[in-house]
Amino acid sequence: MSQIIDTPVDGTLDATGLNCPEPVMMLHQHIRDLPPGGLLKVIATDPSTRRDIPKFCVFLDHELVAQQEEAGTYLYWIRKKLD
């Protein structure tokens, strides 16, 4: 997991303190702004993101590279699909 954390990202979305559906709505906008293959780090505190973000990635064909939980904070690394 540390190799993912050390990997440079193309963008970061801090959705700390936001509740469903806001983190996924913001994710949708941020992922659009990335280049194809770009890596986005998402930081969230809403436990529903554990369900919603993986489903978002599957539905829109993005890659959920890694996810991690640290003391109530949920971290996700998402690679935008190649167009």
Swiss-Prot record:
UniProt cross-references to CDD domains, sorted A to Z:
SirA
> Which residues catalyse the reaction?
C20 (cysteine persulfide intermediate)
Q: GO cellular-component terms in the record?
A: cytoplasm
Q: What Gene Ontology biological process does one annotation of this record name? A: tRNA wobble position uridine thiolation
* GO molecular function annotations of the record: sulfur carrier activity
Which PROSITE patterns does the annotation name? UPF0033
InterPro entries per record: Sulphur_carrier_TusA, TusA-like, TusA-like_sf
Name of a matching Pfam family: TusA
Question: Which keywords does this Swiss-Prot/TrEMBL entry list?
Answer: Cytoplasm
Kindly list the places in or outside the cell where this protein is found, as annotated in its UniProt entry: Cytoplasm
Q: Which family does it belong to?
A: Belongs to the sulfur carrier protein TusA family.
Q: Which NCBIfam families match?
A: PRK00299.1
Matching HAMAP family: Thiourid_synth_A
Protein function: Sulfur carrier protein which probably makes part of a sulfur-relay system.
Q: What is this protein called?
A: Sulfur carrier protein TusA
Q: Which organism is it from?
A: Pseudomonas fluorescens (strain ATCC BAA-477 / NRRL B-23932 / Pf-5)
- Give the lineage: Bacteria, Pseudomonadati, Pseudomonadota, Gammaproteobacteria, Pseudomonadales
